[in-house]
Swiss-Prot record:
Species name: Pongo abelii (Sumatran orangutan)
Enzyme class: hydrolase
InterPro entries referenced in this protein's UniProt entry, alphabetically: Dcp1, mRNA_decap_C, PH-like_dom_sf
Record GO biological process: deadenylation-dependent decapping of nuclear-transcribed mRNA; deadenylation-independent decapping of nuclear-transcribed mRNA; nuclear-transcribed mRNA catabolic process, nonsense-mediated decay
GO cellular component: nucleus; P-body
Keyword terms of this UniProt record: Acetylation, Cytoplasm, Hydrolase, Nonsense-mediated mRNA decay, Nucleus, Phosphoprotein
Location of N-acetylalanine modifications: A2
Protein name listed in UniProt: mRNA-decapping enzyme 1B
Known partners and oligomeric status: Interacts with DCP1A.
Function: May play a role in the degradation of mRNAs, both in normal mRNA turnover and in nonsense-mediated mRNA decay. May remove the 7-methyl guanine cap structure from mRNA molecules, yielding a 5'-phosphorylated mRNA fragment and 7m-GDP.
Comp. bias (Low complexity): 368-378
Post-translational modification Phosphoserine, affected residues: S147, S272, S333, S440, S503
Domain of life: Eukaryota
Cross-referenced Gene3D superfamilies: 6.10.140.2030, Pleckstrin-homology domain (PH domain)/Phosphotyrosine-binding domain (PTB)
């Protein structure tokens, strides 16, 4: 009685399970076997390891009233997604306690873990028997010429569609990596078309001839699968051999893709009638010079681009020439304040000529908003030392140029290296050739060429970038060795012959243009023009000013007598200078207006007295 009751409970439980299964598949008619607790694992081809899925529950093996006749389902208790697999001839099972491994028609490998080993062995035996039955049935059906999938006319449509879908997907997954080219059918659109370019067939190599028949072997009407025994082997080598099959498929894909490449190259060659490899060497030759230029870019740069005048300015102002040298005295030091009035007048007049002659000239074409050159900054410092604070030697751009003026260089080497500084500013003050007024560019070019020839006679053995530094004249020097460089005339007149060394063709394009100088430069020249004429420091228009400077840092070496002559400004030149300054310098006009008001107040005071 107890056994009958137990059998009734089991039968009742199976009826409930069958009803639940029929909700998902109405063609299920009987449950063959049950495994109480299983878990599903999948094999990852990329990671070559097993991964646990979220499918876990009871496994049911059942029969169906439609094809496929058998199948199994894992009723998932973790989620609503169940695992259903039809048992067909394409399934391949292998038992490895407590796992039952199988591969389906989609070449996916799964492992079913059983809580009970007896259930694992029983279900594995049942699965193998059902698979063999399906294979035998399929073999007999194809031999007789009758499809075993159609049971009756009512169910034939659905069964045929399911079978066709499974078979089409199976063939697609097996043949998608085939490299065998498709055979062109004998169509009139292909053979009778005169505009069609037909590729010339290329004879494959021996290795390709051996590889090409291999895909043909897999294109059978009935695809044959590798067994899990060949995949996984025995139990002791199961985990190692499971990883063999997916890499083999990837390797076959790579081999088949490599087989495609020579054939495609031959077709391209026949279509383009050119060797593809002939295009590659010119590409390399085009790329190599660009890379070489990038590699040796610093060697191709012009040496003048590294000079301090060409470097970016800090705070929007160019540093004066004195900031690039290390010496005991600077242009803006308080020692410059005590110089004579005649020297100041000469420097102001010289700067006035620089402004007059740089404006109509063709050399100065830059934006006036750019920083002033070193000579103009030095004049501003020497004229109004109270308005400019001298900078420390370590500020700004002083550090890179200091490499030129170390103590290891000889005196002439110092002069050569320092000559590059004023030579950079030739487009700015190159018109200071000694003319007493505004001269034409043709006359300026002639004078520059004459000066260059004379300088080359005296310094023929010097490098191309080094200018000749004449020695200091006795008339402008004082008792101290560096007094000539400290004075305001030296910062202007010393650079005058240096700017005449290079011809306009060799002027670098990176030289900085000049700005309008400080109005303090023109504060007193308007009130004392006779003293400027009496100072005797203005050069004659047709003569070259003699050597009046030595190296900017070195003491006097061999003084020579001075040959400086002067000529006064004409009324027309003075008128042009005043008109230019009034029109272009607001500060100059303000100074004149202040002087006018001061004279008017003094005249009123004298009348009142």
């Amino acid at each position: 009685m107890a056994a009958v009751a137990a059998g009734g409970l089991v039968g009742k439980g199976r009826d409930i399970s069958l009803a639940a299964l029929q909700r998902h598949d109405p063609y299920i008619n009987r449950i063959v076997d049950v495994a109480s607790q299983v878990a599903l694992y999948t094999f990852g081809h990329r990671a070559n390891e097993w991964e646990k899925t979220d499918v876990e529950g009871t496994l049911f093996v059942y029969t169906r009233s439609a094809s496929p006749k058998h199948g199994f389902t894992i009723m998932n208790r973790l989620s609503m997604e169940n695992r259903t697999e039809p048992i067909t001839k394409d399934l391949d099972f292998q038992l490895q306690d407590p796992f039952l491994l199988y591969r389906n028609a989609r070449l996916s490998i799964y492992g079913i873990w059983f809580y009970d080993k007896e259930e694992c062995q029983r279900i594995a035996e049942l699965m193998k028997n059902l698979t063999q039955y399906e294979q035998l049935k399929a073999h007999q059906g194809t031999g007789a010429g009758i499809s075993p999938m159609i049971l009756n006319s009512g169910e034939g449509k659905e069964v045929d569609i399911l079978r066709m879908l499974i078979k089409a997907k199976d063939e697609y997954t097996k043949c998608k990596t085939c490299s065998e080219p498709k055979k062109i059918t004998s169509s009139s659109a292909i053979y009778d078309n005169p505009n069609l370019i037909k590729p010339i067939p290329v004879k494959p190599s021996e290795n390709q001839q051996q590889r090409i028949p291999q895909p043909n072997q897999t294109l059978d009407p009935e695809p044959q699968h590798l067994s899990l025994t060949a995949l996984f082997g025995k139990q002791d080598k199961a985990t190692c051999q499971e990883t063999v099959e997916p890499p083999q498929t990837l390797h076959q894909q790579q081999q088949q893709q490599q087989e495609k490449l020579p054939i495609r190259q031959g077709v391209v060659r026949s279509l383009s009638y050119e060797e593809p490899r002939r295009h590659s060497p010119p590409i390399e030759k085009q790329l190599c010079p660009a890379i070489q230029k990038l590699m040796v870019r610093s060697a191709d740069l012009h040496p003048l681009s590294e000079l301090p005048e060409n470097r970016p300015c800090e705070n929007g102002s160019t540093h004066s020439a004195g900031e690039f040298f290390t010496g005991p005295v600077r242009p803006g030091s308080p020692h410059n304040i005590g110089t004579s009035r005649g020297v100041q007048n000469a420097s102001r007049t010289q700067n006035l000529f620089e402004k007059l002659q740089s404006t109509p000239g063709a050399a100065n074409k830059c934006d006036p908003s750019t920083p002033a050159p070193a000579s103009s900054a030095a004049l501003n410092r020497s004229r109004a030392p109270t308005s400019v604070t001298p900078q420390a030697p370590g500020k700004g751009l002083a550090q890179p140029p200091q490499a030129y003026f170390n103590g290891s260089l000889p005196p002439q080497a110092h002069g050569r290296e320092q000559s590059t500084l004023p030579r950079q500013t030739l487009p700015i003050s190159g018109n200071q050739t000694g003319s007493s007024g505004v001269i034409s560019p043709q006359e300026l070019l002639k004078k520059l060429q004459i000066v260059q020839q004379e300088q080359q006679l005296h310094a023929s053995n010097r490098p191309a970038l080094a200018a000749k530094f004449p020695v200091l004249s006795q008339s402008s020097g004082t008792g101290k060795p560096l007094e000539s460089w400290i004075n305001k005339t030296s910062s202007t007149e010393q650079q005058t012959p240096l700017f005449q060394v290079i011809s306009p063709q060799r002027i670098p394009a990176t030289a900085a243009p000049s700005l309008l100088t400080s109005p303090m430069v023109f504060a007193q020249p308007t009130s004392v023009p006779p003293k400027e004429r009496e100072s005797g420091l203005l050069p004659v228009g047709g003569q070259e000013p003699p050597a009046a400077a030595t190296s900017l840092l070195l003491p006097i070496q061999s003084p020579e007598p001075s040959m400086i002559t002067s000529s006064p400004l004409t009324k027309l030149q003075l008128q042009e200078a005043l008109l230019y300054l009034i029109q272009n310098d607001d500060n100059f006009l303000n100074i004149i207006y202040e002087a006018y008001l001061f004279s008017m107040t003094q005249a009123a005071m004298k009348k009142s007295m």
